[in-house]
């Protein structure tokens, strides 16, 4: 009988951010491996997808948690501080227990944030099922970088401590990056129940392709070598810095286009930087594009740049987008923060530069723009490495050990 897994998520498809993309990849690959995954989303999913309903997608069943009625519903919908979080956990816990009682599951696998983890932990213990907690990023790091809270605030302390508590109660803990595993061990989580299951990519979807001549003509790119960024524009992604660095590179006589695709909290800053550096003649900021058109825009980008700044979040967490670029056989140039160093072997599968160092960036970018043979060699090896190590079909095999440990540890506590 296939292993039946209930994935508990903050949000999921049809929302298509990095969090949802990883979840899609995991569920699809587990299904291919003969497992039976189902997905349940929290009440917060409806804030991004108000018409959410239970559905099948890609052979996987998606359940939803409504945001409720009465005080709990008002707390969620009104985003009342603290009460909203309590309501989310209460509503989600009840929904998980209801699903477990009405169906048959072998594992409850919750994914951060800790609100999902706490609700799933309580439900799994109540129903005597093994509980796995997967941490995609430390919530408190993200909100600090967005300047929502400070490191000395009560919310920061509560968030970090709840995360640690959920991890301690879990029968197995998954982290997507090695620095996160080390951090969790430093919090007292036993190394024996910590597992590293990294980010992956659907290598069957992201395949090398010819330059889209029609789109190149439409955008006025032509055959000009192009630096590209495709992803969400958070401040720590460093895209506004990239505009400044590219302006310096142009001053040195290199001819290229800078193509930026995506949106986010830093969009206004990126636009401002393009204006202040006088970069509009060669910089194209296109905003968000339809998901099914992403590969067309990738095809115009000769060098994919990931200029993350060095902060705790970027040192800890590996991004998804460089893996898409590597699967496409692109030359990748990234800042040498921990999350990117975990993906790129310098001079073999990509190039690295010192975070925030314009001189180092210009040196590496010039080399890639001027030498097509170097770009091709790096891209070919990157694609080969992704197929070997980072295709979702390969990555999800790591969950077999995770689930075995969780079932063993759950048996010991029952």
Positions of predicted regions on the chain:
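N-terminal subdomain of nucleotide-sugar transferases
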Residues: 1-61, 411
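A short helix/loop element that forms part of the nucleotide-sugar donor recognition site in Leloir-type
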Residues: 53, 207-221
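Conserved acidic donor-binding segment of nucleotide-sugar-dependent glycosyltransferases
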Residues: 346-347, 351-358, 367-373
């Amino acid at each position: 009988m296939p292993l039946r897994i209930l994935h508990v998520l903050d949000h999921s498809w049809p929302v298509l951010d990095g969090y949802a993309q990883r979840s899609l990849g995991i569920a699809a690959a587990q299904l291919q491996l003969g497992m039976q995954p189902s997905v349940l989303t929290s009440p917060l999913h409806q804030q991004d997808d108000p018409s959410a309903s239970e559905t099948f997608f890609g052979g996987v069943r998606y359940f939803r948690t409504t945001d409720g009625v009465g005080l709990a519903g008002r707390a969620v919908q009104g985003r009342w501080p603290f009460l909203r979080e309590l309501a989310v956990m209460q509503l989600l816990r009840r929904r998980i227990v209801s699903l477990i009682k009405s169906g048959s599951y072998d594992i409850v696998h919750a994914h951060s944030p800790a609100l999902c983890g706490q609700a799933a932990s309580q439900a799994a213990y109540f129903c005597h099922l093994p509980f796995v907690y997967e941490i995609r990023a430390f919530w408190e790091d993200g909100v600090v970088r967005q300047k929502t809270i400070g490191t000395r605030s009560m919310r920061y302390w509560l968030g970090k401590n709840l995360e640690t508590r959920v991890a301690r109660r879990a029968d197995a803990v998954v982290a997507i990056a090695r620095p996160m595993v080390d951090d969790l061990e430093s919090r007292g989580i036993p190394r024996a129940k910590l597992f590293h299951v990294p980010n992956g990519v659907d290598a069957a979807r992201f395949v090398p392709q010819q330059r889209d001549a029609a789109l190149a003509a439409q955008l006025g790119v032509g055959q000009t070598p192009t630096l590209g960024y495709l992803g969400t524009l958070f401040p720590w992604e460093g895209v506004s810095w990239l505009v400044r660095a590219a302006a310096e590179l142009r001053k040195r006589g290199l001819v290229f286009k800078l193509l930026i695709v995506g949106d986010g909290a830093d969009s206004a800053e990126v636009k401002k930087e393009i204006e202040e550096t006088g970069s509009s003649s060669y910089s194209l900021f296109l905003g968000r594009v339809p998901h099914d058109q992403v590969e067309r825009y990738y095809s115009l980008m000769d060098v994919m740049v990931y200029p993350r700044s060095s902060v705790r979040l970027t040192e800890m967490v590996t991004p998804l987008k460089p893996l898409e670029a590597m699967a496409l056989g692109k030359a990748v140039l990234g800042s040498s923060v921990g999350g990117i160093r975990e993906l790129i072997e310098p001079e073999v599968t990509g190039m690295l530069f010192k975070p925030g160092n314009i001189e180092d960036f210009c040196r590496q970018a010039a080399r890639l723009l001027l030498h097509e043979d170097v770009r091709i060699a790096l891209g070919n090896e990157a694609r080969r490495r992704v197929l070997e190590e980072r295709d979702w079909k390969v990555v999800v095999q790591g969950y077999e050990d995770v689930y075995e440990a969780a079932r063993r540890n759950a048996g010991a506590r029952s």
